[in-house]
Amino acid sequence: MSGSYAGAPGTGAESSARFTGEESTGPAGKPGTGSAEEAGGRRRRRSCRALPAGRPVGLFCGLTVVDVIQLVEAPPGPDDKVVALDQLVAAGGPATNAAVAFAALGGRAILAAPVGAGPLAELVRADLAATGVELIDCSGGPGGSDRSVLDLGAPSAGAPEIRGEDAPAAGAGLPAAGAPVPVVPEAPGLSVSSCVITAATGQRSVVSTNARAVAVTAPLDRYVARVDRGRRPPPDVVLIDGHNPALAEVSLDLAARAGALTVMDAGSWKDAAARLPGRCDVVAASARFYPPGPTGSVTAPRDVAHWLLDAGARGVVITRGARPALWWCAGGHDSVAPPQVAAVDTLGAGDVFHGALAHALAGTRRDDLTGPALGAAVERACDVAAASTEVFGTRAWRQRLD
């Protein structure tokens, strides 16, 4: 789910908006109480430029949808119509937007998600190719397989090209000349999210069917086999978003063999994904992540962090709107105040946060996940996520990386 954003100009909450975080910390490595601003609320100069280090490989597994985004002066009321100020249609979803952010920061992003065939699926493929994200379609619908779109025909502009023995033959996967093009229905799992952005505040409203029940019949078998045989580089970091749990389990198994750090975007609690937080090195939870407790749902951020650490996570990050992001690990705890920005559009800011967090942690060994390493990664993610809210849409912010 896209990250939330509060305190944007015009809301009355704060005169200048800041992205992510809340709450406070206590003894080293454990949550506590008090003022988050006192713990880590100092103002910082933002830095969101793409770093020049070696190009890390990130595998992102989860949900892909089509985002239809409209910028309006005010949302329509009942039985009302309004004229949008701007619009964008793009691939969306937590893992998808995180992969786009990872690629924008200089990483090689591989997205594994069910997409299938049809006009909406082709729109998704074109958008991902333009952003430099490699798609592995794991859909069980028409056209679905675990073959990368880069294995089919010539690579699209902007996407990494496969060379050597993995390169496809010329015209591979394309219909013969003059052959009829079959008309196929949409894959059952591909959803559309209708997103309305209020121009004065940057706040968003979203309506979506989210992930639908779809059989993932090709759970990365081809990709995993190539990595295991050394024909493709192993991922440096793996991010899952809790959608399509079976696919997430396969990716986490691969990460364990490859020694890759694992990150979970825990936007909200999902019963079907209950096993996943304990298998991940870092769990980035939103304020709406409420795991089950002995007497009901666990809701307080410090209690959520306790729950995740006890479940097996090595590091925990909790974000809540415009207040400082909180993190905990065995090496300590702290909070990070994001830079102040004038928010234009908050849609997908949480997803960008997770993609930037994965990029900052890529290549970090599990045993090296110390407080300073996690804290620096959270600070970096706050900077990039805040920058993403300063322009309309989920793509234009990439041009502002300085």
Enumerate the predicted regions with their spans.
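Conserved phosphate-binding/catalytic region of the ribokinase-like
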Residues: 1-57, 83, 298-402
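Glycine-rich phosphate/adenosyl-contacting loop at the front of the ribokinase-like
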Residues: 1-21, 25-26, 34-133, 145-148, ...
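Conserved phosphate/ATP/ADP-binding segment of small-molecule kinases
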Residues: 249-335
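Structural motif
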Residues: 57-59, 236-237, 282
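Short gly/ser/thr-rich secondary-structure transition/capping motifs
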Residues: 41-44, 213-216, 262-268, 367-368
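Conserved phosphate-binding/catalytic loop of the ribokinase/pfkB sugar-kinase fold
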Residues: 162-166, 184-188, 193-237, 242
